[in-house]
Amino acid sequence: SYLTDKEITDRLVTEAYNRMQEDVQVAHILIKTNPNVATDTAAAYTKIQAAYKRLQAGEAWDLVVKQTSEDNPTKETGGDLGYVTALLPNGFYAFESAAYETPVGKYSMPIRTTLGYHIVKVTNKRPARGELDIAHILLRVKADGSDDKAVKTRIDAVYAQLVAGDRFEEVAKTVSEDKATAERGGAIGPIAINQYEKSFEDAVFALANDGDYTKPVRTRLGWHIIKRTRKRPTLTLEQAKRKI
């Protein structure tokens, strides 16, 4: 009936809204499945259950990850995926639920996603970082890093200009080597977690107030100074209902 559908929808929206208040740092063990091969799914299920039994028997998480996980980029680092936040993409609701419902330091039972079977371990939780509008000044460094020192000297001089009172937007227009954003005063727009390199993200979310800017930050592209122009207000439940 309509009412039960609406009740289910409301419950899911409220759940998503509550989850959006927190970011969760997770690690995982992944056994991949090929959805086109039925026997493959059964074999993968057997493997994930074997890994789960090893954990239950007290074996170290990192060792079991290293020896069993099929997620090559993370298996050498304890399966660490960094922080995630609701809403995860379609097909990952079970993963999201495991992340939010498992206590810090514990791991979930095996769960299924479109990738395969996972065991999810929660390593930390923090208040959600939310979204910021930001701008930046970028001075590029060559891929081989040969001019890193010279560029660092230049960005330090730019930082000194800002400290002396020069307007961020004007300086960005004049010196920034990110052509796409320089002409609009360095404005990038909104940033949420997992969109930029960790050094960049951590620096900008550490800024306490609108209008504050970072000291020079190094990424693969070069040296940045990043300004927080506005913290986007946290949605109310009613606003979230319209968005979700």
Where are these regions (language model features)?
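Peptidyl-prolyl cis-trans isomerase
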Residues: 1-244
